[in-house]
From Swiss-Prot:
Coiled coil: none
Entry-linked InterPro entries: PEX11 (IPR008733)
Record protein name field: Peroxisomal membrane protein 11B
Ranges for region Interaction with PEX19, PEX11G and FIS1 and peroxisome targeting: 211-259
Keyword field contains Glycosyltransferase: no
Function noted in UniProt: Involved in peroxisomal proliferation. May regulate peroxisome division by recruiting the dynamin-related GTPase DNM1L to the peroxisomal membrane. Promotes membrane protrusion and elongation on the peroxisomal surface.
Residues bearing the modification N6-acetyllysine: 43
UniProt subunit comment: Homodimer. Heterodimer with PEX11G. Interacts with PEX19. Interacts with FIS1.
Keywords: Acetylation, Membrane, Peroxisome, Peroxisome biogenesis, Transmembrane, Transmembrane helix
Keyword Hydrolase belongs to the record: no
Membrane topology according to the record: Single-pass membrane protein
Length: 259
């Protein structure tokens, strides 16, 4: 099992390079179509995109095993929320890869009777559930870091002798209960929360990259399942950005969100 996981990790970089090239072809094909390129050139780009997609499916054979191993490790996490989000995400990834393997068998001719449309819809559903769990985990970690940042700021203010009881609720000429002061206070609180969020993400690049990557990936299953039609241009752009961020985490392992 460990030997297979190591082999899968080695092929991961090639799969992500193919993924970046595939979505670059999708984006290029959309641009060529909008600018009235020749049908022959558009056909060649679509064929290249299809070959890259099939090649990625070949490289992902057996990734279900890797996802199940990751789920087994996540079960032992001490934080209940992280344990749930990460475990469920990996289990959905395992099911997604299993459906992807069936699709590869159908497209390669090994199982010509496979209903590819049905299995593609299943795979994108599992992919969507996995991304939802990933984003939930990101939101939870952001909340924890924002609470830590707020507590640290309060301690610094107490040490310096500045009172912070009430926080931003004490700001405003009309007080928290008066109509004249409520709207400016809400605007100030919202601005402070945005600044705090920006500070937290700036101080934790792995979390920032994970949020961006999952947010970009989310458009792909939403479009494929018909839940939110984005168009091939948006899907290609988001897929390309996500692929570049994934490659970046392979080149710089410290940018990978842990656990």
């Amino acid at each position: 099992m460990d030997a297979w996981v190591r082999f899968s990790a080695q092929s991961q970089a090639r799969e992500r390079l193919c993924r970046a090239a595939q979505y670059a072809c999708s984006l290029l094909g959309h641009a060529l179509q909008r600018h009235g390129a020749s049908p022959e050139l558009q056909k060649q780009i679509r064929q290249l995109e299809g070959h890259l997609s099939l090649g990625r499916k070949l490289l992902r054979l057996g990734n279900s095993t890797d996802a199940l191993e990751s789920a087994k490790r996540a079960v032992h996490l001490s934080d209940v929320v992280l344990r749930f989000c990460i475990t469920v995400s990996h289990l959905n990834r395992a099911l997604y890869f299993a459906c992807d393997n069936v699709l590869w068998a159908g497209k390669s001719g090994l199982a010509p009777r496979v209903d590819q449309e049905k299995w593609a819809q299943r795979s994108f559903r599992y992919y969507l559930f996995s991304l939802i769990m990933n984003l939930s985990r990101d939101a939870y970690e952001i909340r924890l870091l924002m609470e830590q940042e707020t507590s640290a700021y309060s301690r610094r203010m107490k040490v310096s002798g500045v009172g912070v009881s009430g926080g931003v609720e004490t700001v405003g000429p009309g007080g928290p209960g008066t109509p004249g002061g409520s709207l400016p206070q809400l605007a100030l609180k919202f601005r402070l929360r945005i600044l705090l969020l920006a500070r937290v993400l700036r101080g934790h690049p792995p979390l920032l990259l994970d949020v961006l990557r999952n947010a970009c990936d989310l458009f792909i299953p939403l479009d494929k399942l018909g839940l939110w039609r984005c168009g091939p241009g948006i899907v290609g752009l988001c897929g390309l950005i996500s692929s570049i961020l994934s490659i970046l985490t392979l080149i710089c392992p410290w940018l990978r969100l842990k656990p």
